[in-house]
Curated annotation (Swiss-Prot):
One of the GO biological process terms: limb development
Annotated keywords: Acetylation, Activator, Nucleus, Transcription, Transcription regulation
Cell compartments where the protein resides: Nucleus
Self-association and partners: Component of the Mediator complex, which is composed of MED1, MED4, MED6, MED7, MED8, MED9, MED10, MED11, MED12, MED13, MED13L, MED14, MED15, MED16, MED17, MED18, MED19, MED20, MED21, MED22, MED23, MED24, MED25, MED26, MED27, MED29, MED30, MED31, CCNC, CDK8 and CDC2L6/CDK11. The MED12, MED13, CCNC and CDK8 subunits form a distinct module termed the CDK8 module. Mediator containing the CDK8 module is less active than Mediator lacking this module in supporting transcriptional activation.
A GO molecular-function annotation: ubiquitin protein ligase activity
CC annotations in GO: core mediator complex; mediator complex; nucleoplasm; nucleus; ubiquitin ligase complex
Family per similarity comment: Belongs to the Mediator complex subunit 31 family.
Domain of life assignment: Eukaryota
The name this protein goes by in its record: Mediator of RNA polymerase II transcription subunit 31
Species per Swiss-Prot/TrEMBL record: Homo sapiens (Human)
């Protein structure tokens, strides 16, 4: 009986840990949040830097499939470099990253729409030629 309760507690704890780490990793996609962390000295804390290194397991497909903001993995990778962590103290750096993300999404959206239109046209041609 006690073993079953302990397993349930472990499962609940693991589920909570997974959710917290998932949420935190996704927050790393926000350059303003990174600037906030840098200005408060989190990136100077060796334990915090080690935690960021530990979080690299999110790059594995087994975990990455749960991410809504894949750019957080790129930020997590960049945070492994001390120079990048130091630059984030500067609000202009965070603003630049934010602008680059917006440009990427705009380009990605346009490219994706064109691809979807081309696929729809191709399917329509296949349907009309197949009849």
């Amino acid at each position: 009986m006690a073993a079953a309760v302990a397993m349930e507690t472990d499962d609940a704890g693991n589920r909570l840990r997974f959710q917290l780490e998932l949420e935190f990793v996704q927050c790393l996609a926000n350059p303003n949040y990174l600037n906030f962390l840098a200005q408060r000295g989190y990136f100077k804390d060796k334990a915090f830097v080690n935690y960021l290194k530990y979080l690299l397991y999110w790059k594995d497909p087994e975990y990455a499939k749960y991410l809504k903001y894949p750019q957080c993995l790129h930020m997590l990778e960049l945070l492994q470099y001390e120079h990048f962590r130091k630059e984030l103290v500067n609000a202009q750096c965070a603003k630049f990253i934010d602008e680059q993300q917006i440009l990427h999404w705009q380009h990605y959206s346009r490219k994706r729409m064109r691809l979807q239109q081309a696929l729809a046209e191709q399917q329509q041609q296949n349907n009309t030629s197949g009849k």
